[in-house]
Amino acid sequence: MFSRRSHGDVKKSTQKVLDPKKDVLTRLKHLRALLDNVDASDLKQFFETNYSQIYFIFYENFITLENSLKLKGNNKSQREELDSILFLFEKILQFLPERIFFRWHYQSIGSTLKKLLHTGNSIKIRCEGIRLFLLWLQALQTNCAEEQVLIFACLVPGFPAVLSSRGPCTLETLINPSPSVVDAKIYPEEITPLLPAVSGEKIAEDQTCFFLQILLKYMVIQAASLEWKNKENQDTGFKFLFTLFRKYYLPHLFPSFTKLTNIYKPVLEIPHLRPKPLYVTVTRDNETIYSTKIPYMAARVVFIKWIVTFFLEKKYLTATQNTKNGVDVLPKIIQTVGGGAIQEKVPELDGAGATEQDKSHSNSSTLSDRRLSNSSLCSIEEEHRTVYEMVQRILLSTRGYVNFVNEVFRQAFLLPSCEISITRKVVQVYRKWILQNKPVFMEEPDKKDVAEEDADKLGLSETDSKEVSSESSGHKRSSSWGRTYSFTSAMSRGCVTEEDNTNVKAGAQAMLQVFLTNAANVFLLEPCVEVPMLLREQVDACKAVLIIFRRMIMELTMNQKTWEQMLQILLRITEAVMQKPKDKLVQDSFARSLAGLLFRTLIVAWIRANLCVYISRELWDDFLRVLSSLTEWEELITEWSNIMDSLTAVLARTVYGVEMTNLPLDKLSEQKEKKQRGKGCVLEPQKGTAVGRSFSLSWRSHPDVTEPMRFRSATTSGAPGVEKARNTVRQKATEVEEFQQAESTAAADCDYLVVGQQPVPRSSSTSDITERLYSDSSQGQKVENSQNLSSSEPKSVQESKGHVTHEHEGVTILVRRSSSPAELDLKEESQQTHGRCRERQKSESTGSDMAVGYSNEAELPVSPWQTCEEDPELSTPTDAVADSDARHWLQLSPTDASNLTESRECLADDCSIIAGGNLTGWHPDSAAVLWRRVLGILGDVNNIQSPKIHAKVFSYLYELWYKLAKIRDNLAISLDNQSSPSPPLLIPPLRMFASWLFKATTLPNEYKEGKLQAYKLICAMMTRRQDVLPNSDFLVHFYLVMHLGLTSEDQDVLNTIIKNCSPRFFSLGLPGFSMLVGDFITAAARVLSTDMLAAPRSEALTLLGSLVCFPNTYQEIPLLQSVPEVSDVVTGAEDVKHYLINILLKNATEEPNECARCIAICSLGVWICEELAQCASHPQVKDAINVIGVTLKFPNKIVAQVACDVLQLLVSYWEKLQMFETALPRKMAEILVATIAFLLPSAEYSSVETDKKFIVSLLLCLLDWCMALPVSALLHPVSTAVIEELHPSRAPLLDYIYRVLHCCVCGSSTYTQQSHYTLTLADLSSTDYDPFLPLANVRNSEPVQYHSSADLGNLLTVEEEKKRRSVELIPLTARMVMAHLVNHLGHYPLSGGPAVLHSLVSENHDNAHVEGTELSSEVFRSPNLQLFVFNDSTLISYLQTPAEGPAGGTSGGSLSDVRVIVRDISGKYSWDGKVLYGPLEGRLAPSGRNPSFQISGWHHHTCGPQSNLFHGEEGDDVLDKLLENIGHTSPECLLPSQLNLNEPSPTPSAMNCDQEKEIIEVILRQSTQEDEYVQRCHSNSAVKVTSQGQPSPVEPRGPFYFCRLLLDDLGMNSWDRRKNFHLLKKNSKLLRELKNLDSRQCRETHKIAVFYIAEGQEDKCSILANERGSQAYEDFVAGLGWEVDLSTHCGFMGGLQRNGSTGQTAPYYATSTVEVIFHVSTRMPSDSDDSLTKKLRHLGNDEVHIVWSEHSRDYRRGIIPTAFGDVSIIIYPMKNHMFFITITKKPEVPFFGPLFDGAIVSGKLLPSLICATCINASRAVKCLIPLYQSFYEERALYLEAIIQNHREVMTFEDFAAQVFSPSPSYSLSGTD
């Protein structure tokens, strides 16, 4: 009927509207056309001009339609007509508010609205009636009557009847009042439903909530629809309605609404715990819904949500969003009733809308979409934005409204768990106000306004209280609609009194205090643990509140009152939530969900508060009381430990100037420095970025901290500005970090906490810290300060003393006052230090870092916590939290930063707020005090009831102590490694936990785990170098604790102490430490006697091994514990030694752990050396040697190798062994021989490489013993019962040595007959030696990682690898040993000293045919030289050299000498020979030299008979003298009778006298017969021959004659030698090969670096610059070897130069098999940078370093930067002239001995043991090199290559020709 088509002729339509002749329906049609086509301003003028006719048109049409509906019922056309009529009615109300205000058509409009509001109408008509009624009521305002107010009070069904003058009223009674006079003739017209509801119409289940939503929504959106001429009336219209709402509805919605909520004068009473309500369950749509029986709870939620809508970001919808698929969607009012309103849950006000519904069975009018779109309950149209903003402005316009809103929000915090979702909405509002956009009432008031403010004005809260307390309204209602009730009366009754309170600025602090107090109610509601869903809801709400708390802590500036309120609230919350009930079931789940977050928030808030304001002692006491009562919560311990980590990082930075994330020791290697220099300034911004992103990693590590997505506001979740803000945070964090680093440098000058070695007087301004920290102790013991408080200190400081009194009841750090005074007293800077600090701070205050950092810091738009909440996906490992965490939640707030800058600049002598001063933020005193207080905030940790929690605390204490120790290690570290800084003035309190630890050891056994942690920390604490020596009281307590622990029956306690108390404890030399030696021995023995696999067996044996030298040093060591199986207490040094060695002997044979067995064997070796060096002649030395000897045949080759190394060590003590027992050195060799013979059969066929290598080690050890023992010992017959029985001749030891060597070369089955008997283990059996001593097995370690074939292929070719593997290791080694013995036994060392082993003579020396001084090809053309190959293994050069003539005369003939140069696997040797038998006439004159000895350097053994060998008298028996001389020069050639060869042999023992006579007779008879025969021949002329004359001798002239003669004498020219004797091809390649072979070493070589570190040296420059050391150091270096002159040294140089650039001398040690050169730093010049560089190059390139350190701190490997140094042996001199040894090695280096890590040795043993250990360490390192070869293996390969490539194969004739004439270019005579 009424279409929306355009009417072009507006004027025509106007005329028709105003034409009274037209029917009212036609006029309505044209009026509707005008409404659609005319602007609102023109319409208002039109309506005001023609108001009467317009109302007539409306009313007539309305009455007509009403009658039609009553008669005909409703249909679609009538509903459309009703829509049009009501639309006109709405426009009348909108355009004519001024007339309506004066009650224009008052009764008619009222009657019409009653018809629409009739409860019998359909829901849609009733909603439309409410909307139009609110328009009318807003227009009437003060001219409304009581009936209109009562109708408003009854619009929402479900509330109690409103009391009036006629009694209780409802909407029904108000629409159709009952007649007051029963017999009256005239009655008011009965109002009936206009459009009754039909059956099937969907009705909201909770009509109260539904109509309340309608009412609240229309109160807002209709507030601005009236076209007032005075626009201000729009505000008054809403205020009028809202006042009525608060009067009639609010008391029912909020029965506990109070006037006390006043942010202008807040009442901050902390709430109490509320019991949980009774929850009822309703199941709807398969979903369980929980509610309470609290009246009007759902309506209360609706109202709170409505209020929240004005303060949260709203979702405005445009007109296009209200259509779907191009078709108009159903009106929102229909959608709401049909869909959303039937739900129990109230829909979100900022949601996206509800679903469509079916249009059937609906009596609702099809109102136009333009009007219906205003009725949405789920979203806010764009056109309503202004009206919502207007209402928001109104709600914040006066103090009364502000207090009202905050009280409503307080009521939201009181909601039960089932409705707590709206509480989270309120939390979002507060979050927006506090953290983002502050409302006007949070702005700071003007000072003038504050001064003039009337304290009595309490705003709306007071008037509301009057309403609540007044009589029940007392309305006197009349039947007429007179002006008996007006807006003026409402004002006089206190409904609206806000106008006088328009100054709403209260300041942020008051608002924060009110929020803190109200928000606590969320936590203080008893949780419903029976319903998990409700529990989760409450937990989520609590976390949302805590998020704001945390952001406030981090980002806001709060005054003291606000801080105190926050701390009290957090304490109350924590105490209420975390206090476990007696049944331990009710609150556990709720408390557990909040525990970590709540504890962390509380502690962080406490720390931040103390940095910003003064916190009273009473609050600290409450803090201590609450947390110490909650120690059963594991979460508390976790958060406390995390906070302590962060505080420790701050303490390190502010007090000690150390950054825990950038420690000096972590960046000292030169490689890292180069990388940093290469990256330049990129590092700092990157670090800042990382810090900015991970603000508080320990909070971020908890997933329950992150705010859920549904809590986020629309402005921050995904907003474009957020990422930009985060980048700003990162940038500013970098700048702040840079400033803080500079600040910490300045603060380092003013550090305090624990004194170092030099006392510095305290200043009066900070000495109060000492008083407060140590004012009381737990036992009531008063701690006295070394300095009294100054009388001039500020009063505030004096009043604030003793904040932590009760804290120390738990932390009993002091045993008594005298306990370690230097450590427990606080140290403060002097006034002079203050002055320096002030100057430095002033200079820094003008720097760019501080100016930029702090000026920009205040601009941070997004806090770190917000970053966490917004970005939960950004996760960072929790192990990196320490300092980055502290850098954020412990940094100053932005506004505090500038204040700090000023205070630091102007008040440098002041102290922190916590110390009574004015400085905020982190300073040395605040950091130390807070660290100390938070440490003790748990109370006495030994009072914790839970053993698990107790153990966790002590476990963390160990971690905390480790951090403090790390800080100490990083103090006074040279950053550039160029100079050593002075010792630190302040050191961390490493013994601070002592009293806790001591007490923990006395706890019952149920606290065992904590006790073990305490023992572990005690050991770590007392095995560390003590900067300040503990006093006697402390030591007595410590020794008592250790004694009780070491004698404990608990095996775990023993294991813990032994594992963690290293031998360093003995090296510290604490007073009285020796009293624990016996306890340690006993405890270690008990640990070793157990079968526990986890027992610290290696540590126990290390302890025992470190004590082997103590009994000789400390002559009487008491044993405080009786020895098992001995009733008396053992005392005295000898008994202790016996006790100790018996344990070592037992474990050296029975220990199952491989490493421990090795340590036990090494310990025995050290003890043997100690006893031999001290000449103690202890009887158990033999037992120790027996164990070591038996271990040689142990299946585990690692253990056996250690035993072999020990035997090799004893080589240098053979003389001491001989003094101990004459046969003992020979016994060593016999053991080796028998062991080799025992192991050889299995080893030579074994596929395991270690078996073969061990045989090689035994062979080399045997060689060392053979070379060390005198020849007489080796020639001594082996005397054993078995051998004497089988072999009466008793072969010498050397014979058995050669036999076993021959077995190694030829195979173990070589000697199987009795005549070739080899020494066996059974032959060694005697009373002193048991070769079959039983040995227990050990658990093998991880197998050695062999190099793969691919790795080998990368190093050598396949052919070379095959060649290397073709060399048989055992036979080759045995051949080398035999060659070595043949050449050197009895000769080494030569006259040139031990440095010369092989010959230095070559073929060109003394060669008349060669002019060059070096070996060259000219040598091969010499006629007097020939080169041969013998047995395909040896190169032999024969050279004929001219002999010198007799002195002072000429010789009859010039005889030549023969020189034989031999090159084999053992080395190069030279022998000179002379003609022994020749013509008498050509006998040479006495020679004044012995060229063979002088040239080759052999030692010349002079013997008496030898000198007269060729110069006896005529007729002397020269042969007789020769035979006699052989007995002197070569005793091994003598017969077993030891008679000279020229002496008659004694009579054989088996021959008697008769037999002897018979033999003599036979011989004489034969002699007589021979003489007779000769006589007969002489007499017979037939047998006579012609006599020949003696030929005259001819002098040989051939250059190779005598060489050829020698070859003939040696049988080399015989046929049987022909296959083993060959010539070499003489060419340039051979020459190069020979030179290369001669350059190879003939001994094992090692180069060892030696460093000297003096006291206070911690940089390489200082260490390398040392030119001399202490006397003990010089004595040690002298004991390492012989000091050799490098310019003339002939042995191994190790890279040192002869020109003096690397020093003039160096220690050198050598045997016939090993050479060691020591690169001693103090021997090398350091006068220039080049010298230092060269020195470092030589020292750093060595694999093994010896470090002699006299510094008070442990040596760090990084001080000497080198990629080598695989093994470092550090020597620390002790006070008792003993030396503590630590060995650090790379993990891949295998075990080596004889010294081990932790050994303690005496000065006599030190050089030899260090030297032996260095050699073994060098061998261990070299064995890791792929395809590493020993010197003889290398020589064997070279020899093999020479022989294969240069051996010349020829016929015998050619061979003889070459031997006859080596060089055919020379013509030789036939007689040569």
UniProtKB/Swiss-Prot annotation:
Pfam families: RALGAPB_N, Rap_GAP. Residues 775-795 have a biased composition (Polar residues). GO terms for biological process: activation of GTPase activity; Ral protein signal transduction; regulation of exocyst localization; regulation of protein localization; regulation of small GTPase mediated signal transduction. GO terms for molecular function: GTPase activator activity; protein heterodimerization activity. The modification Phosphothreonine is found at residue 715. Residues 1634-1842 form the Rap-GAP domain. PROSITE patterns: RAPGAP. It is found in: Cytoplasm. Residues 446-481, 711-730, 758-849 are annotated as: Disordered. Keywords: Cytoplasm, GTPase activation, Phosphoprotein. The keyword Nucleus does not apply. The modification Phosphoserine is found at residues 373, 376, 379, 486, 696, 819-820, 1592. Residues 446-469, 796-810, 824-843 have a biased composition (Basic and acidic residues). GO terms for cellular component: cytoplasm; nucleus. Highly expressed in lung, liver, testis and thymus with lower levels in brain and heart (at protein level). The keyword Phosphoprotein applies. Component of the heterodimeric RalGAP2 complex with RALGAPB. Heterodimerization is required for activity. Catalytic subunit of the heterodimeric RalGAP2 complex which acts as a GTPase activator for the Ras-like small GTPases RALA and RALB. This is Ral GTPase-activating protein subunit alpha-2. It comes from Rattus norvegicus (Rat).
